[in-house]
């Protein structure tokens, strides 16, 4: 009975929160609508490096700082063939409004069903994904995970990682 309970709890954790990803894993595929209602999937970014960052909620002070950091460094990311995608559980409409308000120059994906959040194991809280960033290489392999995100220097930290790789 004890073994059954352990297996049941383990299965429940994976079901609710996703399996932990590790460096070298193939990045989980996704198919989500962006702020304009256009479906995006992992394969759309094949051939370039990809930053996928999860954020709790649009219009929160921390996320504004983080998003604007990516916006301000966008040309540097492009120079290194790096695409950027932000993901939250917000609606397409909320993300569109947020993108326009802050003149963001990259896609925001709406994961209202928490499918991508589960695949990337960021569903720490039901209503908000945990703040986590995944770096993926040109062939779709996970090469780095930022578990601790410094909102003030996050875009610079990512660029430094790629410059030293």
Label for each model-derived stretch:
Residues 17-43:
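N-terminal "domain-start" segment that seeds a small globular fold
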Residues 6-16:
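Sec-dependent N-terminal signal peptides
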Residues 129-165:
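Thiol-/selenol-based redox modules, centered on thioredoxin-like
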Residues 27-28, 49, 130-132:
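Short loop/turn microsegments at loop-to-beta-strand junctions
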Residues 105-106, 124-134:
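Structural micro-motif
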Residues 64-102, 113-118:
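Structural microenvironment flanking redox-active thiols in thiol-disulfide oxidoreductases
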Residues 42-65, 70:
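Short active-site neighborhood of thiol/selenol oxidoreductases, capturing the structured segment around
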